């Protein structure tokens, strides 16, 4: 009898810090232009999105700050730069919408997730507005209060 394959998650990397530092407003799915060694490294789980963001140059979107560590068995015939800028593949309407969002004061575009969709690597990017220190404290208070409410409800149901 054949063994069942373990169900792997499609998520490669998450940017949890983005949810802490920004108010996430609108999300978009973008393709990522990668080299062969980068795809192989992502299959091994070597991707990281902490402090990654999107810039716009010449009508194109570029992902900065994303790190993909090369595998030790990667070819030595070319330079493997873990933090190189990677082109994001978006439709023209999405590009203009994102560019307009970044022109507002305090808004930026950050990468929130990197995942597999069929055999392709996709990057979830989002327009975001920066949080100030008191905003971060407020969300933490709300989170703690929600946990306390759940505990109270569970003890009352017993």
UniProtKB/Swiss-Prot annotation:
Listed InterPro entries: SmpB, SsrA-bd_prot, SsrA-bd_prot_CS
Signal peptide: none
Lineage top rank: taxon: Bacteria
Any Gene Ontology CC annotation: cytosol
Compositional bias (Basic and acidic residues): 132-147
Region (Disordered): 131-158
Location of this chain's protein in the cell: Cytoplasm
Annotated GO biological process: trans-translation
Keywords: Cytoplasm, RNA-binding
PROSITE patterns: SSRP
GO molecular function: RNA binding
Recorded family membership: Belongs to the SmpB family.
Record's function text: Required for rescue of stalled ribosomes mediated by trans-translation. Binds to transfer-messenger RNA (tmRNA), required for stable association of tmRNA with ribosomes. tmRNA and SmpB together mimic tRNA shape, replacing the anticodon stem-loop with SmpB. tmRNA is encoded by the ssrA gene; the 2 termini fold to resemble tRNA(Ala) and it encodes a 'tag peptide', a short internal open reading frame. During trans-translation Ala-aminoacylated tmRNA acts like a tRNA, entering the A-site of stalled ribosomes, displacing the stalled mRNA.
HAMAP family reported for this sequence: SmpB (MF_00023)
Protein's name in the database: SsrA-binding protein
Species name: Teredinibacter turnerae (strain ATCC 39867 / T7901)
Gene name in the database record: smpB
């Amino acid at each position: 009898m054949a063994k069942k394959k373990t169900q792997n998650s499609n998520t490669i990397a998450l940017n949890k810090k983005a949810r802490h530092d920004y108010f996430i407003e609108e999300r978009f799915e973008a393709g990522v232009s990668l080299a062969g060694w980068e795809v192989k490294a992502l299959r091994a789980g070597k991707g990281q999105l902490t402090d990654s963001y999107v810039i716009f140059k010449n009508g194109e979107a570029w992902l900065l700050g994303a790190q993909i560590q090369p595998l030790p068995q990667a070819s030595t015939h070319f330079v493997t730069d873990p933090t190189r800028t990677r082109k994001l593949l978006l439709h023209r309407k999405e590009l203009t919408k994102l560019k307009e969002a970044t022109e507002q004061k305090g808004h930026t575009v950050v990468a929130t997730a990197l995942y597999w969709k069929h055999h392709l690597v996709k990057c979830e990017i989002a327009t975001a507005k920066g949080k100030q220190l008191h905003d971060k404290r407020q969300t933490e208070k709300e989170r703690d209060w929600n946990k306390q409410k759940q505990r109270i409800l569970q003890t009352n149901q017993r």
